[in-house]
Amino acid sequence: MKLIRFGEINKEQPGVILSNGKKIDVSNYVTDYDENFFGNDGIQKLGDWLSKNQDSCPEIHDDIRLGSPLSRPSKIVCVGLNYAKHAAESGMDIPEEPVLFFKSTSSIVGPFDQIVIPKGSEKTDWEVELAVVIGKKASYVSEADALQHVAGYVLHNDVSERAFQLEKSGQWVKGKSCDTFAPLGPFIATPDEIKNPNDLNLWLKLNGEIMQDSSTSDFIFNIQEVVSYISQFMTLLPGDVISTGTPFGVGLGLNPPRYLKEGDVVELGIDGLGIARQSCKAYK
């Protein structure tokens, strides 16, 4: 199943993309894709309901905005330096354990919304990432059981301001949490849609030029390891997002470095998770 949310900003409603590509409105049955939905077996219940009711659901036309495919979660947990070549281009050692940081949930936007380059920014960068949506409360889970706690997978551009992140004292969160810095979507793919999340091609283009082109098979820590590891330190709630890191090819690692500017267009995609596109504008 592919879950979407559509409509005006802060007024999004739940929908589904059917196997034939048709988008339908399921707001007569589902209130939102949130902690309550995921934590109460919402995906299974929605599937059962659709088997009897999908033909009566209104169609969502292509000119309707797609928002983030899930409501604001309790947290976004990110894994840093989870590809060896990206660690090298960042001038950092390959980690022996997952590097974790938070990203503000207020940074979430839709897959085709604009990226706003923050006030005072000169080093806003791109990062294509596979994100995991938690479907069942996870605390002290084993690697063997980790995937049982996953509701689905979603495309994420972990937009990052490198000066805020790396050149000022303190934690990375400052460079990761600006408004519009977490475009998610276009949809959440449930696990049955994704054969192996640890072997997916992912790519990113800047103004049509390929900047990142890799595979999650290059993970240092795979999905099972990451979910289990994080759950040893905090409880993951249904609807929470784990972003699993970016591969080689960010602007920071180029010689000379290259960063986003007003008018730039970023396109990104992951096998089975669709394509997103964001244009950039400066804060005003």
Where are these predicted regions, by residue range?
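N-terminal non-catalytic cap/leader segment that marks the start of a structured domain
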Residues: 1-98, 267
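Short, structured patches in soluble enzyme cores that scaffold and shape functional sites
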Residues: 5, 103-105, 112, 119, ...
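Catalytic-pocket segment enriched in acidic/His residues
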Residues: 5-10, 47, 51, 58-59, ...
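Structural signature of FAD isoalloxazine-binding scaffolds in flavoprotein oxidoreductases
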Residues: 8, 94-111, 124-126, 261-272
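Generic beta-strand structural signal
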Residues: 74-77, 97-99, 113-115, 122-130, ...
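Short helix-loop capping/hinge motifs at secondary-structure junctions, enriched
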Residues: 138-142, 193-196
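N-terminal accessory regions of nucleic-acid-interacting proteins
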Residues: 139-154
